[in-house]
């Protein structure tokens, strides 16, 4: 199966639109073998810290498990550890190691879904201006993340988190 990455996912932080918890989304994506996932909540970035921290926590646990599996494989191969079926134990440890490597390669993609006015920000003339367009923005690197943060924390008085209807 080709690798697949969701680039537009809402968490419980997308008010009235998302229900999934960050932990369950990450766990499911990793279990499905996805190499990453992008959290793009509606009009906010409230879940980004929890998302990034949870991925790092899972990766930290995997580093420890991978080190244990590598040590066990080495011990079984050189004979310092014995068991009834060393070949089966080595195969089991190699599967655990492969799963850990896959999780360690998982990429948390940081983004948001912004609202774009159809005409101009302050135009509110009936049906055409009742809803705006949605635009997905993804951070390519740390500078992109900082730019997203600036977009959402701008002190400009005309900046709105969501278009009012």
PLM regions and their residue ranges:
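Phosphodiester-processing cores and adjacent nucleic acid-binding clamps
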Residues: 1-154, 159
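Hydrophobic alpha-helical segments, chiefly the membrane-spanning helices
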Residues: 163-165
